Amino acid sequence: MTEKTIRLTTAQALVKFLNQQYIEVDDEMAPFVDGIFTVFGHGNVVGIGQALEEDPGHLNVYQGKNEQGMAHAAIAYAKQKNRKRIYACSASAGPGSANLITAASTALANNLPVLFLPADTFATRQPDPVLQQLEHESSAAITTNDGFQAVSRYFDRVQRPEQLMSALIRAFEVMTNPASAGPATICIAQDTEGEAFDYPVEFFQKRIHYLNRQIPTKRELTEAARLIQASKTPVIIVGGGARYSDAREELIALSEQSNIPLVETHAGKSTVEFDFKNNLGGTGILGTLAANKAIRDADLVIGIGTRYTDFTTSSKTAFGPATKFININVSRMQTYKLDAFQVVGDAKATLAELAPLLKGYQTQFGDRIAVYKAEWLAERTRLQNTKFNREAFTPEIKDQFDQATLNEYADSLQTEFTQTEALITINDTVAPDSIVVCSAGSLPGDLQRLWNPAVPNTYHLEYGYSCMGYEINGALGAKMAAANNQEVYSIVGDGSFCMSHSELLTSLQYGKKINIMLFDNSGFGCINNLQMANGSDSFFCEFRDSDNQIMQVDYAKIAEGYGAKVYRANTKEDLISALEDAKKQTKTTLIDMKVLPKTMSEGYLNWWNVGVSEVSNKESIKQAYEEKQTNLKNARLY
């Protein structure tokens, strides 16, 4: 071979290659990799660290504070950019890389592209066992990074410099393919990072990854149109694939043309703004009454870019036994679910092709869509105005805490604020284009039901993995991806705050303002609801000390110690005042709200299959098990 070469270390070649990756969608081209998050340590600081110091190119380098936290920021960046731009994540060997594994799981569950670069042990094995290396008697080849194999869409190891080339090409094919988008992991041996090789210059030429919109076959479109025309009450489930495809206009056009209601998954919510007349909001276990009524009525469900998780299907009890399905998805695997008619294609392109075939078709919903929506808005108004009293208060989550316990919480937390009133107050006060970020606990349920996005692509929920700690760290990534001056609000419970808030400091370090709305009910409230609803007593889900006293934590003081602007708000009036002042700030803010437990919203027309104990001495658990068995009779088996 006489091709021209350039001598680089493996790490230098990696950085040079990342700078040359571009993505083109609908004739618009942009760099695919915008930067890299890293926590330097032994294993990456003298390899990838040296390469980035010497010549980062256009890559922005951010110093993370916890590997999982920074990776969640990278995931949120890709999500907010609709999978069209990414960040890479580099971590040191051993525990640093192990910290990335949970985040890789989050990316995989949500089909979000991130390039993970965990450092590995020595390829030569000369100094083995090195600091932070695991030793297995069965194999010297097993390292911490083998844990990534189960949570990566693509996994590879680089132990020779020339292996980098094929590894990167495979990784970028996976990350830029809508059907397989997800995390790619390339483990690089730490001695290999610094080894040099004469790389062919052509390997570093500008590479454009084309995101072509796949159009279904004529057979698929014709049969899908026939099934819709034969139905009386079809409903469209708007999944994340519809959002990533930018299918808003096509969804509105088809819904208006044929009077088909739209219901949403967490990933699909805000693809179409809430005030569109046929948008009934979130569906499933955390859905609105309106959406779940429409799904109950449906004789045909058109799933667009959805994975049909149990929270979308109410553990496969949401649909009638005769309901049929059409699944439109770029992933052929996803189209097979629920014995659906399979349409493999891009959501936006498919809807554009399908709409002309349905001209003249009208559903039989009539004015039911408007009636359902009006009923739901009245219920939302009720939830906005819930007020605590010390004599005979009935919370939304009934029959779990008695009045004395609720009064104890009111006294200890010095609050009478309900969670639903606080959340809707935030929705009504922030700017319409604000991005809201959340992931775990009871707040995703309140958000899917009660948060009304006025602007598309402003609802950012990680609910594929529902990973506690994503909320604040993900808010940083969303802010990095947001338009100038677009505010980002992290909606987080005290449980998730304690789990991880590392990148709060990073947001202050780099001037990326986020607003943290901290709901403190002194416990893991969501899971407490679940355990008590299934017959157990309240057991290790409340934050109580060894004397059984409710814990009182000043979370505002914690954030203030980092340098954030903080507020305390236990009333609607104080919350509005804090929100308005926070808008004027240029650095990260935190509003510490004490809210009463059991005041989050409850479900509507839903059921969740969980592993209730079949054998117990408690009658309440026996009853919960019998109720589960009864509900399973109404569930599809697959």
From Swiss-Prot:
Protein family per UniProt: Belongs to the TPP enzyme family.
GO terms of molecular function: 3D-(3,5/4)-trihydroxycyclohexane-1,2-dione hydrolase activity; acetolactate synthase activity; flavin adenine dinucleotide binding; magnesium ion binding; thiamine pyrophosphate binding
Protein EC: 3.7.1.22
Alphabetical keyword list: Hydrolase, Magnesium, Metal-binding, NAD, Thiamine pyrophosphate
Binding site for thiamine diphosphate: E67
Cofactor comment: Binds 1 Mg(2+) ion per subunit.
Cellular component annotations (GO), alphabetically ordered: acetolactate synthase complex
Names of required cofactors: Mg(2+); thiamine diphosphate
The name this protein goes by in its record: 3D-(3,5/4)-trihydroxycyclohexane-1,2-dione hydrolase
Region (Thiamine pyrophosphate binding) location: 442-523
NCBIfam families: myo_inos_iolD
Amino acids binding Mg(2+): D494, N521
UniProt pathway: Polyol metabolism; myo-inositol degradation into acetyl-CoA; acetyl-CoA from myo-inositol: step 3/7
Function (record text): Involved in the cleavage of the C1-C2 bond of 3D-(3,5/4)-trihydroxycyclohexane-1,2-dione (THcHDO) to yield 5-deoxy-glucuronate (5DG).
Pfam families in alphabetical order: TPP_enzyme_C (PF02775), TPP_enzyme_M (PF00205), TPP_enzyme_N (PF02776)
